[in-house]
Curated annotation (Swiss-Prot), chain A:
Entry function: Key component of the proton channel; it plays a direct role in the translocation of protons across the membrane.
Keyword Transmembrane helix: yes
GO MF annotations in UniProt: proton-transporting ATP synthase activity, rotational mechanism
Primary localization class, coarse: membrane
PANTHER family recorded: ATP SYNTHASE SUBUNIT A, CHLOROPLASTIC
Source organism of the structure: Prochlorococcus marinus (strain MIT 9301)
Membrane topology listed for this record: Multi-pass membrane protein
Disulfide topology: none
Entry annotated with the keyword Membrane: yes
Superkingdom of source: Bacteria
Any matching Pfam family: ATP-synt_A
TM ranges: 30-50, 91-111, 128-148, 193-213, 214-234
UniProt name for this protein: ATP synthase subunit a
Amino acid sequence: MFFNSLLTNFAALEVGQHLYWQIGNIRLHGQVFLTSWILLGALLVFISLGTKKMENDPKGLQNLLEFLWDYIRDLARTQIGEKVYRDWMPFIGTLFLFVFVSNWGGALIPWRLIKLPSGELGAPTADINTTIALALLVSLSYFYAGLSNKGWRYFEYYVHPTPIMLPFKILEDFTKPLSLSFRLFGNILADELVVGVLVFLVPLILPIPVMFLGLFTSAIQALIFATLAAYYIGEAVEEHH
Amino acid sequence: MLAFNFFGATEGGLFDINATLPLMAIQVVALTYILNSLFFKPVGNVVEKREKFVSNNIIEAKNKLSEVKKLEADLLTQLQSARTEAQRIVSEAENESDKLYKEALDLANNEANASKEKARLEIESQTNAARDQLSKQADDLSELIVNRLILEK
């Protein structure tokens, strides 16, 4: 009996339902784009407000943005190295900001209040398409970083200490995007589901600590994603001797 | 039914991969360029300019500090040499005055000795003269006595 009611509750969460947009022959998950546009719009407004009047003595928003910039620079510099971190800082920073804003936006804004014909609004990173897109961008980036920095010598990395490593290193090229995308997707979706189920079962008080835990995980996941992306790029541009 | 929805039915499902993926990738790449021109470049310029300013100021202050230290050391050596010079001059003057004092003392001693000697010689000569005279008078007297005695006889 209980199991059955749980199932119906799950069904009420509309897991795996999407708001489809049909453009010609292609189909899109509309809810992902809607939330991502709202969140990225907010992010861009926030950033343009903060950088509107840049001063040598930072005040208010500029201070916050400079802290953020410094944080991202430290992240990129420690993972990629002094030599090329400058080229990759915008990419790493964008990944961090995109994932962070998506995760927190998905967790903090009561999207459920907005009714859609099908599916529901939520964190864009809780959709597998988004996370795979991000992970593939990371893969492309580290290949590009390695090839543009070291040319064909990039492939020395595959036989680096010994040629025995070759199959493992090739396998890594597949496991990296896989683990990146599924880690982010799984964490954010699981967080949304746990909060959703708890809200259904016990609407008062009990979901609040879980929501805080969700905010914590969301931030950590953004940091992990950006750090790993930077680490992969750093690994690709690193000089072996 | 639920399991069907969960794991990718033909329509919907959690693992429904479609054109959302490439479009999202394009959107993220576009976002990278937008954020680069809106956020990373301007903020980076300001922060790096300030960092350069601060580090320049620190270097300048360090240079000034080392200059001050050098000047201080210079002054200290100058002070030291002036002090030794002063000491030298003082001791020289002391020696000089000592010498002068000794010379004057010697001179005075010599003079005193000379006048003492002279006085002694004079006393001696006068004594001699007096003795001579005395002995001469004694002789005269004795002769007189002798003569008188001889005459009386």
